[in-house]
Curated annotation (Swiss-Prot):
One of its GO terms (cellular component) is mitochondrion. Belongs to the TRAFAC class translation factor GTPase superfamily. Classic translation factor GTPase family. EF-G/EF-2 subfamily. The keyword GTP-binding applies. One of its GO terms (molecular function) is GTP binding. Transmembrane segments: none annotated. This is Ribosome-releasing factor 2, mitochondrial. It is found in: Mitochondrion. NCBIfam families: small_GTP.
């Protein structure tokens, strides 16, 4: 904790020789500048020299406006990485560097930065909080070892927090909680922690609790009670940068603080004792006195329980007022895991061979080869001065500059010249990226995509074997786009630049899609939401200077094959033939183990091209060395897949909308491979035309529309009017109405019991506001409704409730559109 850093005698004597040892006994009003800690973090040469056990890869996750970026900026400042504090309102943050981010005051894309703290290296990824940018969070979580969840103390556990928490739980990421904005009227630390226990279904330990001055009259948040060390940390009001802290002992002379400290310590020891027997032993050895158990033992137990996902450490603060951030940073280094303490990632081979992986002292070892380097590309972006960048997490080995890497998706080899680590948008060139670290491969236009696995070897350029070159790390799921907007260049001469810029954005953000409606000649952009496409429009027109018109944003409807039985398609010439069938599919994931199946999860489409279904001519030419075609068998096989995929994207027979929930089975294909001629374009066209031939049966195709799960949070007094509006105007099917009160939530029994058992200190600020009473009468309406009817719903909801209600929604699936509904839509 922060107190150990402030009061550790050896450290202080090392850093500040003139500090007298006698002053350390005068602790009640000891005033120390945290600049000492910043100096301590710079005792080593560079952060790249930090050993793997002292490396932390963490994400900052939360609902929008909870204070993620504000907290991250303070962490950067206190680490000594920046000499100023960046503020969202002033548009000068390190991590929010896009023009659109600074203008809107929100995070749009993930940002990575590396900071030093307490002789540790913390790789931080700051993520967006808005639901439209969920994909940025998804791909961040895949490469992290832990996360800090930031909560607004007034709003509590909000909808997007629950979603992100579930995503992190699925990946078994250890997490910490930081209850922010404790300085605001209506802030409820204990109420928020109780929501954490029940809504997020997790145990907690309170590492610190809030301290208020004038708590009976006009409570003012001034610091925290350190439950581990029994200290009161008060941030000096005169210090606007939050570096000077008064550290005081907590004893019987401060009865109210002492009572909170004792009860919080008792709850901590009892919770840890249920997990770690060493805590029970220490409790018994210390005459059953909760206060006598050493901070070192408690820290070890909390760390072990956090990494094991048994519980979550809780901290509090007010980041905008620069209070409470340093203890949070200590918690990150104390409790979240190093890359050596995380589960082995899911590793597969495209050839379906078994891949061995084990954790060693220097990181993951794959296939018993400590010199084999394997990394995952989780983001691609175009830097203003450095050009294309591929962000990569290295899992094993060491990626070295000027080395050869293999992209297992394409099989291509690339010579990597420069490697970087990022500090917001500022790159720093490095010689290598070691296992467990995050860095950037620079200088490649389209060679790396999100989700690619890169493989290299430390000994030679040829050391990556055939099997190793097919290694694939866990995929990154891409959610389906829900909204469309057409884009048209001003003139034909503007089209090339427009397409180039769209390609750049799609490489950066795979949740953004583009296709062309051939009948209308329109280019259609598809995204996750209205804000997502608005940001795309801003970047194209303002940042990239594209001369084009973007039409109004509309719901992304789809067409789909709805015939009850498969329909056959055929295209043939004298030398090329493709025969296939098309049918409807409900769940594309059920085809994961089918031979030759290619799954397009975002559209729920499947294309199956088994290798055994090539013609005898093709197969015999492969086996008999009579192959004359300049393209390989694998490239021709891929051409068939790509041709089918293009046909699905060009749309259905009615309105040319992209096909969804469609299965294409290729039953036979043939090409003259014994002749030396280019076959990829004609074979791709043949597959495309075979699919197109099925579209002639228009009566076998119908429309699908996005269906959403909706939760509306509303006061009891407004519930009737809101429910009526949902069911009538929004055509919603209301499933249930529940109290938002924690006492009535249907959660696991153990979570209810845990919430009742937990010690939670008084919420002084809530007793001074009507928010507490309002909270007790809130209702939650659960419904499902077509996405089209939810466009602009927030403004309508605010109008109905005087701005007091909120809602969230998540994608449920695609639903077939009935004829009566079709008439309403089109």
């Amino acid at each position: 904790m922060i107190v150990r850093n402030l009061l550790g005698k050896n450290r202080l004597c090392c850093l500040q020789p003139k500090l007298l040892l006698s002053t350390l006994s005068q602790r009640p009003q000891l005033q120390l500048s945290l600049q000492l800690l910043c100096r301590a973090t710079r005792l080593y040469a560079t952060v790249n020299d930090i050993a793997l056990p002292k490396t932390r890869n963490i994400g900052i996750i939360a609902h929008i406006d909870a204070g993620k970026t504000t907290t991250t900026e303070r962490m950067i400042y206190y680490s000594g990485k920046s000499k100023r504090i960046g503020n969202v309102d002033e548009g000068d943050t390190v991590t929010d560097y896009l023009q659109a981010e600074r203008e809107r005051g929100i995070t749009i894309q993930l940002a990575a930065i590396t900071i030093p703290w307490n002789n540790h290296k913390i790789n931080i990824i700051d993520t967006p909080g808005h639901a439209d940018f969920t994909f940025e969070v998804i791909r961040s979580l895949r490469v992290l070892d832990g996360a800090v969840t930031i909560l607004d103390a007034v709003a509590g556990v909000e909808a997007q927090t629950e979603k992100v928490w579930k995503q992190a739980s699925a990946l078994k990421l250890p997490r910490m909680i930081y209850v922010n904005k404790m300085d605001r009227p209506g802030a409820g630390f204990s109420r928020t922690v109780k929501e954490v226990i029940q809504k997020l279904e997790t145990r907690v330990v309170l590492c610190n609790t809030p301290f208020f001055e004038n708590q009976e009259l006009n409570p003012e948040f001034r610091g925290v009670i350190d439950v581990i060390h029994g200290k009161l940390l008060k941030w000096k009001e005169a210090d606007e940068f939050g570096k000077e802290i008064d550290v005081e002992d907590i004893d019987e002379t401060k009865p109210e603080l002492y009572d909170v400290y004792c009860k919080a310590r008792e709850y901590m020891v009892e919770t840890l004792g249920e997990y770690d027997e060493s805590i029970i032993d220490a409790f018994l050895e210390n005459d059953e006195n909760y206060l006598k158990i050493s901070p070192e033992l408690l820290n070890r137990a909390i760390r072990k329980a956090t990494i094991d996902n048994y519980l979550v450490p809780v901290f509090c603060g007010a980041s905008f007022r620069n209070i409470g951030v340093q203890p949070l940073m200590d918690g990150i280094t104390n409790y979240l895991p190093s890359p050596l303490e995380t589960p082995v990632p899911d590793i597969k081979s495209k050839k379906k061979q078994e891949i061995s992986a084990k954790m060693a002292n220097n990181g993951l070892i794959i296939n018993n080869d400590p010199k084999l380097t394997v990394g995952l590309v989780f983001k691609v972006m175009n830097h203003a001065t450095r050009g294309p960048m591929a962000f990569v997490r290295i899992y094993s080995g060491k990626l070295v500059a000027n080395s050869m890497v293999v992209n297992s998706r394409t099989g291509a080899k690339h010579s990597v010249r420069k490697l970087l680590i990022m500090h917001g948008d500022q790159p720093e060139e490095v010689k290598f990226i070691g296992a467990g670290n995050i860095g950037v491969i620079s200088g490649f236009e389209d060679e790396f995509h999100t989700g690619d696995t890169v493989i290299s070897h430390a000994t030679s350029k040829k050391a990556v074997g055939t099997m190793e070159s097919t290694i694939k790390l866990m995929p990154i799921d891409i959610p389906p786009p829900l909204f469309n907007s057409s884009i048209e260049p001003f003139t034909a001469g503007d089209e090339a630049h427009m397409k180039k810029c769209i390609d750049i954005l799609i490489r950066e953000d795979p949740s953004l899609k583009v296709h062309t409606e051939e009948d209308m000649g329109q280019t259609i952009l598809s995204g996750m939401g209205e804000l997502h496409l608005e940001i795309v429009r801003d970047r194209l027109i303002n940042d990239m200077k594209v001369k084009a018109n973007l039409r109004d944003i509309a719901v992304a409807y789809k067409e789909s094959y709805i015939g009850k039985t498969p329909t056959n398609g055929l295209f043939e010439t004298e030398s090329i033939q493709v025969k296939l069938s098309i049918e409807h599919v409900d769940d594309c994931k059920s085809f994961e183990d089918v031979d030759g199946a290619i799954i397009f999860e975002d559209q729920n489409n499947v294309i199956i091209v088994p290798e055994s279904l090539a013609s005898e001519t093709v197969q015999s030419a492969t086996e008999g060395r009579r192959w004359k075609c300049p393209s390989s068998y694998e490239e021709l096989h891929e051409a068939v897949v790509n041709g089918c995929s293009m046909a699905l994207q060009t749309g259905g027979p009615h309105l040319g909308l992209s096909l969804h929930s469609t299965l294409v089975k290729v039953e036979f294909w043939n090409a003259p491979v014994e002749v030396n001629e280019e076959l990829i374009p004609p074979l791709m066209n043949a597959a495309r035309e075979a699919v197109q031939s099925v579209k002639a049966s228009e009566n076998k195709f119908g429309f699908l529309e996005p269906l959403m799960n909706v939760r509306v949070f509303v006061d009891s007094a407004d519930m009737g009017e809101v429910s009526h509006d949902l069911s009538q105007r929004c055509q919603a099917l209301i499933h249930s109405v529940e109290d938002e009160s924690l006492l009535n939530l249907e959660t696991a029994n153990w979570a209810k019991d845990e919430a009742e058992r937990a010690y939670l200190p008084p919420d002084y600020t809530m007793s001074k506001t009507a928010l507490a009473d309002n909270y007790k009468t809130r209702k939650v309406i659960h419904a499902e409704t077509p996405l089209k009817e939810m466009i602009g719903y927030l403004s309508k909801l605010r109008s109905l409730t005087g701005g007091k209600a909120t809602f969230d929604m998540s994608f449920l699936g695609m639903r077939r559109v009935t004829q009566s509904r079709l008439n309403q839509i089109f």
